[in-house]
């Protein structure tokens, strides 16, 4: 009898350890990665890409010879201003979406924000018409000596129907200030030029 009791007491720590492991596995299985606020907002913009952004376009603001600017109905976290731009084209309507995220005269502040926005946008996942697009791009460290830095994130070739869709993170000098923008657009060209293609 004493031998059985001793065996039982020896098993209790092992049983507790086993239960703890099962509990930890159960918790980890329930943890689902969540999108940050910026990813959620940009995801709303990208989700309307197949519709030509028609569901998020607001009132016309400015008309120029080559472009027409509209308000955007989607609010993006921390954005100063969001807009949709329609470009002149003889083939089809071409729209791009832009958000001004920061304007400052301090380069270090701009560089820090640029990195934060990149981290937020990297691996952005959006489901469009049954296809999941995961946007990725290599980080480029900005330099105060370079007046224009842009990082392009794209869904690669795993989603061929979305391969022309790009997200650009831009840091550029504007007079004495530094401006950060996020752009969503369709790139028709195969070259490395940034921004939407315009048909002559």
Question: Residue spans of the language-model regions?
Answer:
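Generic N-terminal leader/processing signal
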Residues: 5-10, 19, 62-64, 68, ...
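A structural detector for beta-sheet-dominated domains
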Residues: 43, 71-77, 83-88, 100-102, ...
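Bacterial Sec-dependent N-terminal signal peptides
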Residues: 1-35
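Generic hydrophobic, helix-prone segments enriched in Leu/Val/Ile
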Residues: 38-46, 110-118, 182
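N-terminal leader/targeting segments
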Residues: 30-95, 199-200
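A charged, solvent-exposed segment within the mature domains of Sec-exported extracytoplasmic proteins
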Residues: 120-199
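N-terminal Sec-dependent export signals
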Residues: 1, 13, 29-33, 40, ...
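Long, charged/polar, surface-exposed segments that mediate recognition or autoinhibition
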Residues: 80-145
């Amino acid at each position: 009898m004493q031998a059985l009791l001793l065996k039982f007491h020896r098993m209790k720590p092992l049983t507790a350890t086993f239960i703890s492991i099962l509990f930890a596995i159960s918790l980890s299985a329930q943890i689902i990665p969540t999108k940050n606020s910026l990813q959620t907002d940009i995801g709303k913009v990208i989700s309307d890409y197949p519709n030509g952004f028609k569901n998020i376009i607001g009132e016309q603001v400015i008309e120029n010879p080559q472009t027409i600017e509209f308000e955007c109905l989607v609010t993006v976290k921390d954005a100063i201003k969001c807009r949709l731009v329609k470009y002149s084209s003889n083939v089809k309507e071409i729209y791009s979406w832009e958000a001004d995220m920061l304007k400052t005269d301090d380069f270090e502040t701009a560089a820090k924000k640029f990195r934060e926005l990149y981290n937020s946008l990297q691996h952005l996942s959006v489901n469009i018409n049954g296809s999941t697009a995961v946007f990725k791009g290599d980080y480029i460290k900005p330099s105060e000596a370079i007046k224009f830095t842009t990082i392009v994130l794209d869904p690669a070739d795993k989603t061929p129907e979305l391969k022309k869709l790009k997200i650009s993170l831009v840091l550029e000098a504007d007079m004495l200030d530094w401006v950060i923008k996020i752009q969503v657009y369709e790139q028709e060209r195969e070259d490395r030029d940034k921004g939407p293609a315009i048909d002559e």
